[in-house]
């Protein structure tokens, strides 16, 4: 269909003046006589017209008479070039020449047409129009109008995109009508002007679409000349309005039209989405000029005012990364296929670039700092702090510096703190204070409650409180740092504990709970994750955020705690003994240590709570637990809190009664002082050169301590410290595997060392660089045991043997070493405080070692007849000799 059908003369008369007035108003035409008539001759020769450049004009068809169309065309030719034109689209002076071309000249165009870029018109002059030949004779020109309607007919809505004036923001209608006055077609105007379908607003993938009608045949645009991108470096279109610029390739093969004048309605680049800020990702045609047939001639596609109707020059696109890094985006004015030096287009570009720098659109860009002021990296769970990164001092008056993240809880984060002045370490619990955040207020309340409780507690099995402070919007609490981690962590890494470890840990937890309950304080969150273990096997009860001081007026406990460790009365929120909730949680923790999982862990959420609160049955108790352990668990998991024993009563239970505490032996008097000197010296052996003596089996040592020493000079259990057992390691500790094949020197040393039993290593080392070589140590221990316990050679005189037989004078010891390979070398103290082998003995130190060290070694090994004396590590003859 044409742009309009044959219109009635009456309708054309009514629209004539409105069209002329609109053109005079927007194009600055001086008067109405620019619309003079044109020759009737043009109507008869319309089939032979060849336009050098221009577009199909729709105004002549609206004229009531042919003379009006001729006069209008002549008025364009007679227009004075001195008339000022609006910018940036400059109205060129249109001249008409008789090209004299005919249809026979078309093959020359197809074969010899070379690419060249046509310049834009100069600001106040008409572009020179060369007498080009080779245009298709049956191609008619058409007028182009802006988006603002010139007339009242509906066809005004099917016009080319708006020409955006970069200087004043006004829309300037552009009417480019290059018509040969001497050559016109005789075809009917209704057949000449056909509207382009509305689908042309959307990019078409087919280059065969003909926007101007059926007269443009086989339009093909070479892709190599049209790679013009508005945003070549980004998938995002340019968010700014591009300056109006026409890039028309000269080589358009097989179209029969040689254009010598730029067209304002030619959009080589950009899709119907154009480059508006909200367009998002455009199609590929916007980036690489894919469908140039529909983009070259776009007479009816209407873009938004934010869109540029002409191709945007190649520029750095403000994409997701360049938006932040670059300033205002300015065009660079390159031509895709080359440029004409000194062309008006270049001058226009330079002028526009100086007068109108394209601003960046407002962007929602986050702060440069990745963390908000109230939510720093220290509180971000997704960005844990590296151990190597230590923040500056928390505050100018604080002693502690925050280090790596140790863990995260429901009420804050825990960091490692270090005092660079004293070298101390602590655990820093941090909570961000935010008054309008309910979670922050609750966290601060829990931390304040923990401070109030811990500040009144001093116990070896309760984590120690150092202090607290508020820095900016954060509250810090400084606690004792327990490097071994929690029971939960150990269970996850090493599996379930042995019963000896369970006994030992349970006894220490009970000790802390008894102290806590004596102060009428309930913990309310006893579980493996809140029980810490240090490297020496000492247990610390931690996390008192839910602890509560019980008073006489206290009502039922609030619903706080972990569901799997929660007592039934807490779930049902019933009245009862408040302190007994910790006893129930302790029983659940014992099962957790034995099975790595809390009771009723097969249920989740509400079913688990229903099972705990209403079920009459006890959870499953593992069979490998002893009867004492099973009975202990049953007493703790009594549903009636009144039937549960107290923590002080459970300390007398057989399951924990015989467990030796993890305390270092402390006895009064000179022997204790000497014993501490000897034990500390033995622990200070240089591990880099040699290993200590093999670790002794603490089970036998314990049995010996209970029975007492029966021979010798009255040396009994009362003379030695009672707590002689090694601290318990939860996994792989030698004490729990006394009958395993890996014992004595063959066993790897436990990370937990005893003050009295020296852990050993199976790696023999040579040399005496400040330490005892391994074979000397083992030979000393083995021979001393053989000589002191039932050996063929009895000691000389009872008590004198214990004080003098181990440390003898050099002459006697040399004789003994020659006669028996079991004879140990002498031991003496060097200046560094370590034990050295040799034969020079200082008698001033003899009482210390002879009276205490030798007695200790003898007393601990009287019962160790099953000690693994491996032949590979002892001297010949020593292992063949019976005790």
Curated annotation (Swiss-Prot):
Binding of ATP: at which residues? 406-414, 429
Tissues expressing this chain: Expressed in roots, leaves, guard cells, stems, flowers and siliques.
Q: How is its activity regulated?
A: Contains an N-terminal autoinhibitory domain.
Provide an example Pfam family for this protein. Pkinase
Enzyme Commission number = 2.7.11.25
- Major place of residence: cytoplasm
> What if the gene is knocked out?
Severely dwarf plants that rarely survive on soil, small rosettes, compact leaves, extremely compressed shoots, and short, sterile flowers. No proper elongation of the zygote and differentiation of the extra-embryonic suspensor. Excess of stomata in leaves.
Coiled-coil region(s) = none
Q: Which GO terms describe its cellular component?
A: cell cortex; plasma membrane
Q: How does it assemble?
A: Interacts with ASK7. Interacts with BSK12/SSP. Binds to BASL and MPK6.
The record describes the protein's role as:
Functions in a MAP kinase cascade that acts as a molecular switch to regulate the first cell fate decisions in the zygote and the early embryo. Promotes elongation of the zygote and development of its basal daughter cell into the extra-embryonic suspensor. In stomatal development, acts downstream of the LRR receptor TMM, but upstream of the MKK4/MKK5-MPK3/MPK6 module to regulate stomatal cell fate before the guard mother cell (GMC) is specified. Plays a central role in both guard cell identity and pattern formation.
What is the protein name stated in its UniProt record?
Answer: Mitogen-activated protein kinase kinase kinase YODA
């Amino acid at each position: 269909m044409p742009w309009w059908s044959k219109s009635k003369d009456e309708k054309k008369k009514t629209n004539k003046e409105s069209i002329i007035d609109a053109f005079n108003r927007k194009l600055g035409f001086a008067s109405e006589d620019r619309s003079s008539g044109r020759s009737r001759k043009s109507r008869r020769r319309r089939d032979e017209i060849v336009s050098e450049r221009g577009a199909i004009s729709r105004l002549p068809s609206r004229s009531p008479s042919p003379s009006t169309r001729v006069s209008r065309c002549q008025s364009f030719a007679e227009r004075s070039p001195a008339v000022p034109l609006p910018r940036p689209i400059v109205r060129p002076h249109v001249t008409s020449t008789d090209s004299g071309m005919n249809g026979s000249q078309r093959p020359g165009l197809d074969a010899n047409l070379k690419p060249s870029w046509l310049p834009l018109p100069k600001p106040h002059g008409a572009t020179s129009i060369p007498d080009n030949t080779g245009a298709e004779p049956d191609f008619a020109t058409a007028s182009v109008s802006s988006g603002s309607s010139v007339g009242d007919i509906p066809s005004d809505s099917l016009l080319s995109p708006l020409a955006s004036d970069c200087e004043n923001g006004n829309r300037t209608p552009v009417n480019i009508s290059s018509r040969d006055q001497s050559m016109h077609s005789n075809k009917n105007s209704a057949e000449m002007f056909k509207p382009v379908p509305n689908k042309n607003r959307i990019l078409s993938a087919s280059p065969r679409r003909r926007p101007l009608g059926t007269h443009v045949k086989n339009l093909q645009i070479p892709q190599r000349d049209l790679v013009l991108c508005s945003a070549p470096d980004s998938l995002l279109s340019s968010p700014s309005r591009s300056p109006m610029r026409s890039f028309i390739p000269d080589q358009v093969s097989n179209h029969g039209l040689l254009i010598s004048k730029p067209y304002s309605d030619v959009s080589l680049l950009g899709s119907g989405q154009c480059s508006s800020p909200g367009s998002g990702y455009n199609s590929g045609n916007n980036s690489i000029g894919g469908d140039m047939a529909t983009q070259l001639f776009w007479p009816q596609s209407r873009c938004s005012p934010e869109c540029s109707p002409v191709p945007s020059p190649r520029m750095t696109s403000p994409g997701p990364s360049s938006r932040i890094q670059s300033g205002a985006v300015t065009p660079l004015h390159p031509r895709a296929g080359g440029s004409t030096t000194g062309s008006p287009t270049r001058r226009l570009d330079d002028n526009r670039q100086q007068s109108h720098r394209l601003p960046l659109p407002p962007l929602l860009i986050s702060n440069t700092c990745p963390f908000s002021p109230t939510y720093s990296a220290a509180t971000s769970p997704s960005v844990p702090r590296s151990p190597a990164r230590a923040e500056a001092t928390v505050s100018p008056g604080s002693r502690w510096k925050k280090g790596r993240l140790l863990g995260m809880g429901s009420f804050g984060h825990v960091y490692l703190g270090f005092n660079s002045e004293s070298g101390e370490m602590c655990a820093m619990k941090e909570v961000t204070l935010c008054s309008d955040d309910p979670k922050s207020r609750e966290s601060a309340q829990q931390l304040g409650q923990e401070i109030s409780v811990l500040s009144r507690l001093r116990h070896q099995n309760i984590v120690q409180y150092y202090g607290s402070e508020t820095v900016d919007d954060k509250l810090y609490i400084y606690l004792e740092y327990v490097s071994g981690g929690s029971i939960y962590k150990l269970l996850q890494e090493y599996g379930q504990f042995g019963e000896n470890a369970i006994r030992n840990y349970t006894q220490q937890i009970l000790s802390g709970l008894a102290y806590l309950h004596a102060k009428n304080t309930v913990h309310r969150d006893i579980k493996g994750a809140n029980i810490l273990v240090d490297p020496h096997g000492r247990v610390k009860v931690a996390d008192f955020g839910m602890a509560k001081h019980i008073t006489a007026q206290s009502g039922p406990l609030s619903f706080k705690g972990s569901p799997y460790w929660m007592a039934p009365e807490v779930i049902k929120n019933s009245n009862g003994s408040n302190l007994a909730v910790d006893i129930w949680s302790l029983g659940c923790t014992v099962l957790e240590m034995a099975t790595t999982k809390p009771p009723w862990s097969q249920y989740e959420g509400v079913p688990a709570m229903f099972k705990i609160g209403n079920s009459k049955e006890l959870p499953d108790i593992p069979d490998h637990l002893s009867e004492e352990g099973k009975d202990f668990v049953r007493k703790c998991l009594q549903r009636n809190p009144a039937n549960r024993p107290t923590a002080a009563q459970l300390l007398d239970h057989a399951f924990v009664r015989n467990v030796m505490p993890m305390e270092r032996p402390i006895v009064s008097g000179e022997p204790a002082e000497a014993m501490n000197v000897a034990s500390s010296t033995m622990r200070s052996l240089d591990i880099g050169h040699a290993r200590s003596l093999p670790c002794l089996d603490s089970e036998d040592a314990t049995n010996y301590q209970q029975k007492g020493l029966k021979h010798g000079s009255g040396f009994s259990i009362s003379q030695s410290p009672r707590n002689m057992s090694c601290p318990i390691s939860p996994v792989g500790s030698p004490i729990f595997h006394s009958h395993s094949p890996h014992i004595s020197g063959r066993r790897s040393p436990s990370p937990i060392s005893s003050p009295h039993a020296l852990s050993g290593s199976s790696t023999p080392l040579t040399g005496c660089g400040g330490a005892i070589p391994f074979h000397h140590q083992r030979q000393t221990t083995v021979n001393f045991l053989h000589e002191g316990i039932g050996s063929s050679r009895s000691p000389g005189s009872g008590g004198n043997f214990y004080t003098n037989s181990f440390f003898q004078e050099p002459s006697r010891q040399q004789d003994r070493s020659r006669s028996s390979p079991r004879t140990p070398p002498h031991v003496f103290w060097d200046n560094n405080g370590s034990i050295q082998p040799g034969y020079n003995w200082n008698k001033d130190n003899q009482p210390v070692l002879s009276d205490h060290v030798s007695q200790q070694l003898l007393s601990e090994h009287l019962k160790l007849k099953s000690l693994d004396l491996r032949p590979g590590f002892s001297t010949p003859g020593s292992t063949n000799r019976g005790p």
